[in-house]
Amino acid sequence: MIVTTDGFYTTTDPEEVRRRFIERISAVSSMEDGRIFATDQDKPCNNLVQITAMEPFVQTKKIIKVEGFHMDSAPIDAVKHELEKYTGLSHLSTGKNNVEITNITAQKGLALKKYIKKLGLTEDEVMVLGDSQNDLSMFEHFKYSFAPENSCRG
């Protein structure tokens, strides 16, 4: 799935991506969560547009994030290993069966540091909460960092 400033896109059949996305959500949380995703029209998986030509797409869209998922974690691990070769990119997972690729500066911790500076606060005046790998940059930048007991272990 490719996330841009104006929507969600895929290079494959949107219905297949939607089905697999819901399957993945159901596998890692509950079947009820999968049903919620299946019926909530605001969810990205329900608003995918198929890309027919990549070159014009990348020339006209501002890409925020690329996400890949697979029920088997081995292909995801292989992609993560390959991504280590590239500078300027950050990758993380919110579970064992996905990888999210963003610009290296697109991290919650860096964004929060900028925001609190704008508010006139110091890092010692901020507490952060997170439960997944996409929260790690906040934990690295703020000493008052907490995660619930049931959070992702990496």
Residue ranges and their predicted role:
Residues 154:
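Acidic helix N-cap motif at the loop->helix transition within catalytic regions
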Residues 3-129, 133-138, 150:
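Conserved acidic, metal-coordinating active-site core of Asp-based
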